[in-house]
Amino acid sequence: MFNRPPVNRSRRSLMQSLLISPLALSGIGMAQTQVGTPATPARIGTVYTGDVINGKKVVSSLNTDDLEPGKKHLLYFQGVQMSTGQHWYVSVVVAKGARPGKRITLTSGVHGDEMSSVHTVQTVMGQLKPAEMSGTVMAVLDIARPAMESMQRRWPSSGRGFELTDMNREWPGNENGFSAVSRQAGLVFNRLLKPNTDLAIDFHTGTTGLDVPAFHIGDMRIPDVKTMMLLYPVPAIWDNPAYPGVLHNAYIDAGIPSFTPEVGVARRLDLDMTPIFVEGTMNVFKHYGVMPGAIGRTAVDANVYIGKSAVPVLTTHGGFIELLVKLNAKVTPGQKVALQRNAFGEVVAEYTSPVNGLVGGLRSDATSEPGNVLLFILADAAPLSGAAPYPE
């Protein structure tokens, strides 16, 4: 089990450091594969409920050691109950190699409006040939099922009137928690993810209203996290210790190296961007000996930019937005990045970059109320005028 670097648990303080510069490509080296494996949790057995849905057996807990080697297994995991007593079922694909090896888990659908992440995982699993593999790859595709059914970021609950909960603030959850989403997280983490995982990749996209390019979020102080992230040909990495409640942070707390790829915009498939993440994921499998083959393009080939902070530019007025920069554009302090007009067409606000950095997110809606994130910048220097860290 790796020794995790000490982390200040305050969410805001995690994002305060703004001191990193883009690393010279010659200085970016792959971390060596971690020696040893995370502490093994108590073994759980596979429990079949006896139900079959669309030809797939249903499990309430899974141990991939129980599955036949050299094959793909399609299952449903029985999650938390709905208000009518039926369960939410989560789609699980296990590619069980013919030989033992690393166990790598891919997740998507923690936010319900993030479609390219799901497509990326589906594509990866479709390319695997278990008979040629050493180890196991498990994909869990639609974790926040009710959010996905309504194509929205947050989990809808009706226990205290209608409310929306961000599932990616609930991990590792609690099987006996005070909300359905907390219980779903607890069931999935304790009975499916943690017992079957040595390395984990939690795929996301931007959210409705905020577009992002291809980039990663992860803590590069952890050797296996650094190694995995640099195996993707992505143009940017946010080197960031995750705060509590996020799935990849829950993995790390459990001794399992993990990070989050961000696969473009929400709500639609970006078929130009997903191949970047498919290629990188295959590189991870090859690096860790799960599948044979030569490693393809990596972060070095993409001239990767690494930032330590994400600094937002917030709207100060309501009105119509006119963006003056694009995703992945380099910006400098004082550079005008957007302006805002009222209904008469009069300019009511102009916005400038507080830092040197790379544009990592842009508001996609053409209007905004005051206080919304207009854009955020992956920063390589301390912000001017006390600019606040990105609140996500």
Sequence positions of predicted segments:
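Structured catalytic-domain cores with a bias toward divalent-metal coordination
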Residues: 2, 9-15, 32-392
